[in-house]
Amino acid sequence: WIKQDCLTIPAEHMKMKRLHRVPLTAYALSLLNEAKNTSKHKRSSYVFPGQKSSKHANSQILTNFMRQNSFFKNRLVPHGLRSIARSWMADHNVSYEVAEACLAHIVGSSVSRAYQRSDFFEARMQIHKQWDGFIQDCARSAQLTSPKADSIETPSLSQS
């Protein structure tokens, strides 16, 4: 699913049954690579295998983590992360169409969609790079990462 700087989610795995390409920054790739390398199941084809088997992790794992963690409990749910990102995009003057494309939302009438078929990948890559910087700043402020985290080289997680 990952090739170079793009994660392609097949249509059958998407809510709206449409293929979705996600731009990946160097930092995002490094986090995915770290997750894969720290897994108990290094031979699994999944970045996030389950704890007890090499099959994929339970889809509710993040929800369960947030419910059990005292910091997040009653403060944030996974879907709230999408809301935070969307609000950040609005505050940073990201166009409506590009912001909605970042969330894999379908916008416009069936007629307008017949003519506008771009997934705005290049524009979304620029947004992801800006969001990446925001996330790294937040992580540094919370002392969750080193000050040099943004000097990470692009890792070799991608499969050509």
Locate each region found by the language model.
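Conserved tyrosine-mediated DNA breakage-rejoining catalytic core shared by Y-recombinases
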Residues: 1-34, 107-110
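Active-site-proximal structural scaffolding
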Residues: 2, 15-17, 25, 79-83, ...
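Short, basic (Lys/Arg/His-rich) helix/loop patches that form interaction surfaces
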Residues: 22, 30, 34-53, 60-101, ...
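Short, polar N-cap/turn motifs at the start of nucleic acid-interacting alpha helices
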Residues: 1-6, 73-75, 94-116, 137-147, ...
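Acidic, low-complexity interaction regions
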Residues: 121-133, 141-160
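Flexible interdomain linker/hinge and immediately adjacent N-terminus
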Residues: 10-17, 49-52, 118
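A short linear boundary/processing microfeature
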Residues: 15, 37-38, 105, 117, ...
